[in-house]
Amino acid sequence: MVHVSNRSIQGMNILFSSWAVVLMVMGITLDKWVELISEDERAKMNHSPWMMCCPALWPEDDLKVVRIMMTSSLGLSFLLNLILGMKFTYLIPQNKYIQLFTTILSFFSGISLLWALILYHNKLKQGQSMHFSSYRITWIMYTAYLNVFFLSVCGVLSLLECKLSTSSCTCLNIHKSDNECKESENSIEDISLPECTAMPRSIVRAHTVNSLNKKVQTRHVTWAL
């Protein structure tokens, strides 16, 4: 069975969350998520869900909900990476509540991003029947789905870290109770020892008293003679 420490889990968690943030920022700067193709296949236009103004092939700006969800996912990813970094450098306590919070944050950020991508695909299919003939997905779109995977892995790692810390706490409590039992047994033995050692002392003292009495009696006899 492979043993994984908490520090290695925290390091992998920071690595995956950092990659998720980097790819999200890269997706904001690059606007070639999808290539829209017109009906005569002459006009081609790049499109991204981060665009505030829509191109001529897609005049209606109905991606406000998608942008809000992707913005919330980006903000939560930044917050997750910050908390994981502070926890790795011991700036915040490493308890199960922080680990549960990072787990919820990871899964919620991944679900928000996945839901935004599904909505964006739905809008592309709706626009295909009205504004353009077809579209082609580029590699940036696949990196967005890779971000969903990274955030899900962060949630699983946070759950694993919480489980390991909980099991280690129970083992420490059991070890502490065993030590307390051993200390109590030792104290009982220490208390019972003086009672056993007191008996020979009393015998020795009685013997000395009897010997003194015999000496006194012999002295009295000699003086009488």
UniProtKB/Swiss-Prot annotation:
InterPro entries recorded: TMEM225
Recorded GO CC terms: acrosomal membrane
Keyword field: Cytoplasmic vesicle, Membrane, Transmembrane, Transmembrane helix
Organism name: Homo sapiens (Human)
Subunit and interaction comment: Interacts (via RVxF motif) with PPP1CC.
Membrane topology classification: Multi-pass membrane protein
Transmembrane regions listed in the UniProt entry: 9-29, 73-93, 100-120, 137-157
Origin superkingdom: Eukaryota
Pfam families to which the protein is assigned, alphabetical: TM225
Cellular compartments annotated: Cytoplasmic vesicle, Secretory vesicle, Acrosome membrane
Function: Probably inhibits protein phosphatase 1 (PP1) in sperm via binding to catalytic subunit PPP1CC.
Annotated motif RVxF, positions: 219-223
Lineage: Eukaryota, Metazoa, Chordata, Craniata, Vertebrata
Protein name: Transmembrane protein 225
Main location: membrane
Cytoplasmic topological intervals: 1-8, 94-99, 158-225
Coiled coil (residue ranges): none
Extracellular membrane side: 30-72, 121-136
